[in-house]
Swiss-Prot record:
One function term, GO molecular function aspect: mRNA regulatory element binding translation repressor activity
PROSITE patterns: KRAB, ZINC_FINGER_C2H2_1, ZINC_FINGER_C2H2_2
Cross-link (Glycyl lysine isopeptide (Lys-Gly) (interchain with G-Cter in SUMO2)): 109
Subunit: May interact with MVP.
Protein name per its UniProtKB record: Zinc finger protein 540
Name of encoding gene: ZNF540
Subcellular location, record wording: Nucleus
Protein's organism: Pongo abelii
Zn-finger (C2H2-type) residues: 187-209, 215-237, 243-265, 271-293, 299-321, 327-349, 355-377, 383-405, 411-433, 439-461, 467-489, 495-517, 523-545, 551-573, 579-601, 607-629, 635-657
GO terms (BP aspect): negative regulation of DNA-templated transcription
Family: Belongs to the krueppel C2H2-type zinc-finger protein family.
Length: 660
């Protein structure tokens, strides 16, 4: 028997206008998925001709029945069958494509659509041998869904439908006999009395009562009523996403998902609201939008009274109150209440960041993060607060800001009763009480309460400093550091001391400065009891007790406990004195030395004694002076036990003993 090339008609299912109108939304969606997948599989097998009209219509989201009679009979080279294509009549059974003797069908599934049966031949491993000495060909791992149906009359699907019309034939009285739709005939469910247009719908409905779910997933045990549902579900386990966007490379499990996504690139919004002329990418978005005009919000939460337009969002919201988190990450065990949150979370483990900013090269895990980031380059802040006019790059920032005006904080901590505007803020806060630090550094094992803090910490190991100052080129690990640094270039010092009039760039500098006037030293050493104005000074002091001197000078080998001391010491070798006095021209290696020197010219004496009112340029001079009032003499001679208020006095005294 001669080999014949398989045409597009061999793998298509046709409907007349009347038949198409009988299908419900789910069945039309199934038809669209199957047809598009058939066509894509044929293309992958070598077809390079023009695209059939029916495929074009399906891709555009239009109804295919108009072009059903125009389906091309064009032949597709590279794919062979053992039978020539035949015109199909309404009274003849549709036959299978039969393969050569060595053919093995690993798996066969049947998809039903209003009584029509789609034969789904999976992974056909066939070897075709031509009559004229052609080499063996193997077609493996190809998924081809054929319109042909097995002639095996014992197949259980024949109980629903034994024959199907060719699309060139209109629906007639024989349609009922074939399991098709006849709008005049109603089928009643004996269990609940529900009425259906056809046997197929009734059969599907009855599975609700019987609980029949014959298709089981071997991976997770989940069961489905139909094989095509199982097929789609299995892609979640395999990770298979056969539909790829040509623009950005993003892949999808279903073709309709790709179709919706592509509208983002084209900018097409074909679904328009007749009330306000607003356009949308999908019909679902339009349907949701219409409820704004109708005011229909049918799903109300009994816990908090919040209302929702869609039951899907309502069910997601309910999980906040119940605490149910059905979506668990297999990598780290973290659970989520929403499937989309799990999908986003999993990208953390893969490390994939497919969305790159063309301006600065920064990459992101999610497309909307990139969209938000782009606004920083464009300077756009589209989200404006109607109360105060403040604008934001990100909608979430605006939502957080609004809580300032409303003052509503519905989420309260059960331990300390502190209230928060957002549940996420409460979750983070609760870690203070529990001590939970879920984000651990793999390099050093240090753990953190916040992921953002871990990200900043990891840059210590990698050395990455992504934030660069455009003025001087200096780079920083943390965004807040560059924000502070930028104020150096502006020379703006908005924070002024009421006592002495000194101004500061940052509020915390002013806070520390005010302790000089108040004498407050909140940071105390547990070893020796010495107290400090600044936390940093205490940290440096603690190194004296530990004996740790991690900063070594490569020039002379001298070690230092403080980085600042080490930096200043290095200037001895380099001789660099970058800080010059504008009054007298004297230069200094440290900026602090220049500031102290400038007090000679200005006459500034910020350190005042509370006992007698005497003022000093240096804090150390005030400390020495206060010993006159207290009588404290901390410097004692080890030879004669005489004590002194100042170290310089002890130094001079020791010369009398020839100690120095």
């Amino acid at each position: 028997m001669a080999h014949a090339l398989v045409t597009f008609r061999d793998v298509t299912i046709d409907f007349s206008q009347k038949e198409w109108e009988c299908l419900d939304t789910t069945q039309r969606k199934l038809y669209r998925d199957v047809m598009l997948e058939n066509y894509n599989n044929l293309v992958s097998l070598g077809y390079s001709g023009s695209k059939p009209d029916v495929i074009t219509l399906l891709e555009q989201g239009k109804e295919p029945c108009v072009a059903a009679r125009d389906v091309t009979g064009r032949q597709y080279p590279g794919l062979l069958s053992r039978h020539k294509t035949k015109k199909l009549s309404s009274e003849k059974d549709i036959h299978d494509i039969s393969l050569s003797k060595g053919s093995k069908i690993e798996k066969s599934k049947t998809l039903h659509l209003k009584g029509s049966i789609f034969r789904n031949e999976w992974q056909s491993k066939s070897e075709f041998e031509g009559q004229q000495g052609l080499k063996e060909r193997s077609i493996s791992q190809k998924k081809i869904i054929f319109k042909k149906m097995s002639t095996d009359r014992k197949h259980p699907s024949f109980t629903l439908n034994q024959r199907i019309h060719n699309s060139e034939k209109s629906c007639d009285s024989n349609l009922v006999q074939h399991g098709k739709i006849d709008s005049d005939v109603k089928h009643d469910c004996k269990e609940c009395g529900s009425t259906f247009n056809n046997v197929y719908q009734l059969t599907l409905h009855q599975k609700i009562h019987t609980g029949e779910k014959s298709c089981k997933c071997e991976k997770c045990g989940k069961v489905f009523s139909h094989s095509y549902q199982l097929t789609l579900h299995q892609r979640f386990h395999t990770g298979e996403k056969p539909y790829e966007c040509q623009e950005c490379g993003k892949t999808f499990i279903l073709y309709p998902q790709l179709n919706r996504h592509q509208k983002i690139h084209t900018g097409k919004k074909p679904y328009m609201c007749k009330k306000c002329d607003k356009s949308f990418f999908s019909r679902l978005e339009l349907t949701q939008h219409k409820r704004i005009h109708t005011g229909k919000k049918s799903y109300e939460c009994k816990e908090c009274g919040k209302v929702f337009q869609l039951v899907f969002y309502f069910k997601e919201h309910e999980r906040i109150h119940t605490g149910k988190k059905p979506y668990e990450c297999k990598e780290c065990g973290k659970a989520f209440s929403v499937c989309g949150q799990l999908t986003r979370h999993q990208k953390i483990h893969t490390g994939v960041k497919p969305y790159e900013c063309k301006e600065c090269g920064k990459t992101f895990r999610l497309s909307f993060y990139l969209t938000e980031h782009r606004r920083t380059h464009a300077g756009k802040k589209p989200y404006e607060c109607k109360e105060c006019g403040k604008s934001f790059n990100v909608r979430g920032q605006l939502n957080r800001h609004k809580a300032i005006h409303t003052g509503i904080k519905p989420f309260a901590c059960k331990v300390c009763e502190k209230a928060f505007s957002y549940s996420g803020d409460l979750r983070v806060h609760s870690r203070i009480h529990t001590g939970e630090k879920p984000y651990e550094c793999k390099e050093c094992g240090k753990a953190f309460m916040l992921r953002s803090v871990l990200t900043e910490h990891q840059r210590l190991h990698t050395g990455v400093k992504p934030y660069e100052c455009k003025e001087c080129g200096k780079t920083f690990r943390v965004r807040s550091q560059i924000s502070l640094h930028k104020k150096i270039h502006t020379d703006v010092k908005p924070y002024k001391c009421v006592r002495c009039g000194k101004t500061f760039r940052f509020g915390f500098y002013l806070t520390e400065h005010q302790r000089i006037h108040t004498g407050e030293k909140p940071y105390k050493c547990k070893e020796c009891g010495k107290a400090f104005i600044r936390r940093g000074n205490l940290k440096e002091h603690l190194k004296i007790h530990s004996g740790l001197k991690p900063y070594d000078c490569k020039e002379c080998g001298k070690s230092f406990s403080r980085r600042g001391q080490f930096t200043e010491h290095q200037k001895i070798h380099t001789g660099v004195k970058p800080y010059k006095c504008k009054e007298c021209g004297k230069a200094f290696s440290r900026s602090v030395d220049l500031r102290i020197h400038q007090r000679i010219h200005t006459g500034e004496k910020p350190y005042e004694c509370k006992q007698c009112g005497k003022a000093f340029r240096l804090n150390s001079h005030l400390t020495e002076h206060q010993r006159i009032h207290t009588g404290e003499k901390p410097y004692e001679c080890k030879v004669c036990r005489k004590a002194f208020r100042q170290y310089s006095h002890l130094y001079q005294h020791q010369k009398t003993h020839n100690v120095i």
